[in-house]
């Protein structure tokens, strides 16, 4: 998972590592504290740190743009853009790690004793880019089961994995949705939306409906690819449109 992330995001892998460490130890601190007020403060610190980092990379330049537009009208000096590169999967691994910490805070989950186990959960590569977001109480038991068997047994389980055929089939449907539906609809929709004044109302309505189909096929396709890849590895992750 970390190799995949480093290959696509290079040094921004530091953010994934920070999010993992941040949530792992703050969840432990929440679990170890019996003081309700302290637990709440730790959770707030976690939320501010995690969401603040996400907001910085996703919305900093948007905020600067709005400020500069206002500054231009009132005669204030504009501030330079940060031009931050958006790390791949930052929304998904941020919310996935937060869901773990919040579940610990609510008493629904006992914090993981193993940092490697938690890191694997946060960075599980099939769904790192486009989800679906995993819940720790669904995923960690599967991981622990596989960690408690020998390497030989694990290899045999993967070879004779009854979900292998199903996983490949789901991935194939995902690629079909993405490549044959979403990618072929996109140019047509973009052409209409780029110059809507040149088209009649009926065409614009059809393009709007087609855009909805494009978004569904694109997102659903990525999700199916993730679910299928996870099944091939022996993990079951939730259907995103049933458990968003």
Report residues per predicted region:
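Membrane-embedded transmembrane alpha-helical bundles that form the catalytic cores
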Residues: 1-244
């Amino acid at each position: 998972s970390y190799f995949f992330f480093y290959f696509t995001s290079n040094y921004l892998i530091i953010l994934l590592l920070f999010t993992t460490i941040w949530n792992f130890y703050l969840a432990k601190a929440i679990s170890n504290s019996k003081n309700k007020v302290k637990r709440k403060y730790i959770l707030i610190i976690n939320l501010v740190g995690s969401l603040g980092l996400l907001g910085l990379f996703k919305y900093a330049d948007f905020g600067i743009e709005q400020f500069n537009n206002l500054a231009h009208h009132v005669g204030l000096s504009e501030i330079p853009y940060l031009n931050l590169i958006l790390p791949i999967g930052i929304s998904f691994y941020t919310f996935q790690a937060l869901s773990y910490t919040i579940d610990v805070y609510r008493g629904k989950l006992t914090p993981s004793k193993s940092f490697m186990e938690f890191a694997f959960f946060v960075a599980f590569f099939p769904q790192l880019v486009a989800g679906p977001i995993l819940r720790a109480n669904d995923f960690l038991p599967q991981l622990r089961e596989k960690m408690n068997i020998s390497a030989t047994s694990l290899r045999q389980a993967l070879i004779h994995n009854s979900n292998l055929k199903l996983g490949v089939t789901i991935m194939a449907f995902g690629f079909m949705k993405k490549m044959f539906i979403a990618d072929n609809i996109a140019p047509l929709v973009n052409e209409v939306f780029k110059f809507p004044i040149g088209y009649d109302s009926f065409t614009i309505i059809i393009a709007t409906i087609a855009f909805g189909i494009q978004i569904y096929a694109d997102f659903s396709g990525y999700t199916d690819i993730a679910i299928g890849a996870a099944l091939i590895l022996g993990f079951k992750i939730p259907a995103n449109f049933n458990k968003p």
